[in-house]
């Protein structure tokens, strides 16, 4: 039996605010399928909180909903951006607020689904106003961290200001660079700026948070099945098409979706298919590990399911959600 950890929130006291469901969890845990079934049952719309599923050219590699799903339920913030365009968490926050308001007008239940920590953190804790970073400074930071390595970069950043590395893993290049950039521009850490600034929050809504949090082994098995299915669905052709666009537009090394770089090297005959699959699955496992760490420390759920969502446990999931969240 799945053990549930319920928060201390008293749902009966939250009736006056508009209800929003968040379905979160590591990659390949069944979030999208659960969102679809909930949306069908409770007159909902599905809003994307995955940073890779926004791109038009990557429906297969980013595991976007299929055409059948789009036809059954309205999906928002999926498959709308060209691969070479920048898109910040601030932009996502503005769009998601708009979609929530539209759903409220139509009396639809917003179901926000995804595993991108930055998106979910902003949604729940508000938009933090940080200074703009010049491109030249970004490039400088990248060169430094490549030269000295993330651990040395971490130590040097810590010497400047201890709060610059607050809650940052020494191997997390992205967050280390972001922290360094902010400090170079403002002479303050992100932690210090957040304490000073007012944060724009969505206080007029009730967020009911569902976390699918199965053992890693189950997720790794799902990742393997999903990768095999991606190849069958045409992931290689998807990458081939994008490589042509990259060359035509001279927009290289912008795509971060797992599997793209690996299949690109396969098409360039740098690796065989077995090696390509091994590298992709290892990258996926590494990503899942980071997600597990983030959800464990940064996401307080109302319900936690300790298994992947599948057809065989559909009734159980839906009943628990109805009884614990949606009856009040």
Residue ranges and their predicted role:
Residues 2-328:
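Phosphate/pyrophosphate-binding catalytic cores of soluble transferases and nucleic-acid-acting enzymes
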């Amino acid at each position: 039996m799945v053990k549930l950890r319920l928060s201390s929130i008293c749902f009966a006291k939250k009736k006056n605010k508009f209800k929003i469901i968040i379905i979160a969890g590591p990659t390949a845990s069944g979030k999208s399928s659960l969102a679809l079934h909930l949306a069908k049952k409770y007159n909902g719309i599905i809003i994307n909180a995955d940073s890779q599923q926004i791109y038009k050219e990557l429906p297969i590699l980013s595991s976007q909903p299929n055409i059948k799903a789009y036809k059954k339920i309205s999906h928002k913030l999926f498959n709308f951006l060209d691969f070479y365009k920048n898109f910040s968490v601030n932009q996502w926050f503005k769009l998601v607020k708009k979609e929530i308001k539209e759903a409220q007008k139509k009396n639809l239940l917003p179901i926000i689904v995804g595993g991108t920590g930055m998106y979910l953190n902003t949604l729940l804790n508000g938009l933090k106003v940080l200074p703009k970073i010049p491109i030249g400074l970004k490039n400088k930071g990248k060169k430094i961290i490549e030269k000295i390595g993330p651990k040395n970069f971490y130590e040097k950043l810590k010497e400047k200001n201890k709060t610059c590395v607050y809650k940052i893993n020494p191997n997390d290049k992205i967050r280390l660079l972001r922290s360094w950039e902010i400090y170079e521009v403002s002479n303050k850490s992100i932690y210090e700026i957040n304490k000073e600034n007012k944060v724009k929050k969505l206080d007029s809504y009730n967020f009911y948070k569902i976390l699918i949090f199965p053992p890693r082994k189950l997720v790794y098995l799902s990742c393997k099945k999903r990768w095999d299915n991606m190849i069958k669905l045409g992931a290689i052709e998807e990458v081939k098409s994008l490589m042509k666009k990259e060359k035509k537009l001279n927009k290289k090394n912008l795509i971060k979706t797992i599997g793209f770089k690996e299949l690109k090297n396969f098409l360039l005959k740098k690796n065989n298919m077995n090696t390509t699959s091994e590298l992709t699955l290892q990258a996926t496992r590494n990503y899942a590990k980071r997600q597990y760490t983030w959800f464990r420390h940064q996401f307080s759920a109302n319900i936690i399911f300790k298994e992947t969502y599948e057809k065989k446990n559909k009734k159980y999931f839906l009943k628990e959600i109805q009884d614990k969240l949606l009856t009040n």
